[in-house]
Curated annotation (Swiss-Prot):
InterPro entries: CcO_II, CcO_II-like_C, CcO_II_C, Copper_CuA, Cupredoxin, Cyt_c_oxidase_su2, Cyt_c_oxidase_su2_TM_dom, Cyt_c_oxidase_su2_TM_sf. One of its GO terms (molecular function) is copper ion binding. This is Cytochrome c oxidase subunit 2. The lineage of its organism: Eukaryota, Fungi, Dikarya, Ascomycota, Pezizomycotina. It comes from Podospora anserina (strain S / ATCC MYA-4624 / DSM 980 / FGSC 10383) (Pleurage anserina). Component of the cytochrome c oxidase, the last enzyme in the mitochondrial electron transport chain which drives oxidative phosphorylation. The respiratory chain contains 3 multisubunit complexes succinate dehydrogenase (complex II, CII), ubiquinol-cytochrome c oxidoreductase (cytochrome b-c1 complex, complex III, CIII) and cytochrome c oxidase (complex IV, CIV), that cooperate to transfer electrons derived from NADH and succinate to molecular oxygen, creating an electrochemical gradient over the inner membrane that drives transmembrane transport and the ATP synthase.
Amino acid sequence: MFFLINKLVMNFDAPSPWGIYFQDSATPQMEGLNELHDNIMYYLVVILFAVGWILLSIVINYVSTKSPISHKYLNHGTLIELIWTITPAVILILIAFPSFKLLYLMDEVSDPSMSVLAEGHQWYWSYQYPDFLDSNDQFIEFDSYIVPESDLDEGGLRMLEVDNRVVLPELTHVRFIITAGDVIHSFAAPALGIKCDAYPGRLNQVSVFINREGVFYGQCSEICGILHSSMPIVIESVSLEKFLIWLKEQ
């Protein structure tokens, strides 16, 4: 039982077979996306049952040609026309305002403590830490390739593990600068609420604030060629002390 619980907890930050919901949130923006999704689902469920009830009532009560009120209320009802015009408009407004607010907040890039440059290639990712230097006084940079299934360690995730992970400190404002070296790619990490297109010759940026330690998996989300599925993204969030140790090892 303990093994199963630990296995489930580990897989919450990665795609799982037959998954029907989001991965566990690890950033404020992903928590906001979860909340927005749940709120919209509430409206959709209410609409589904309301429309279903109305249709069923019409079929049962007004389909008969003997009904003296069917034409009066269904073909010439000003009140009902106002209701089915105003009600959807109000619902759309209730959905739109939280959506616009979240969209604006996700587009804002707070004053970052550090930046990471992510560059997509066919078919791997390159990363650079422009705020830190290695032992040769060069920017810390490395390439990240998928680990073949034959080389996976025990417990490794197929098509998701890489040879070099992006290591970030938790509780730190980080800016990802995203670009591409050949064709269009997309940098996506669902648990972090990140999805940003990578264009050759153009820099896009997205802010992330990881609020817990963990290993978070993502993939290129733009079809970029025959090995598009072989461009996983692995971001490891560690404590600041562990991050400083990792920097010294580079």
